[in-house]
Amino acid sequence: MNDLDSELMICYETMQNPETREKLALELSKEVASKERWKEIYDSKPLNNYEIGKTSYYLNRTSFSGKLVSAAWGYRPKRSLPPERWGERIIPCGKYLENTKLTNLDFAEIIRTEGKDVLLYVDPPYFLPPKHKHYRCGFDFRRSY
């Protein structure tokens, strides 16, 4: 699995590792989904990959439409899975990721990679959005390949 968004891929790596996956599920189960906590985490500066993964997961689950760029508070108590149940998603997802190669590369490198028994599903890259409203990593269509 590949994405140019390094924070997203660090989040997946955090879930992929059995030790950090368990820690992530446990710590997030004790979190509070509030606008104040969201703002505190949004403004934080994670110090290591584990903290980046944890922050990314929290913000994805509590931001409007899961957006992490120009994010806005979007958690809805009756519609959003509460933090105490996030482990129900983290644990199985991480187990699926255990045998998955995770990369943080430009898509042009990925599609040129040869391999046996490789499945490529290429989600078209997004054009550079105005002011990076939705995605951290846009696509410069003028770039030559």
Predicted feature residues:
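SAM-dependent nucleic-acid methyltransferase catalytic core
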Residues: 2, 6, 15-133
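Short alpha-helix immediately C-terminal to the canonical SAM-binding loop
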Residues: 9
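Conserved SAM-binding loop
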Residues: 12
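SAM-dependent methyltransferase catalytic-core segment centered on the flexible catalytic loop
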Residues: 127-145
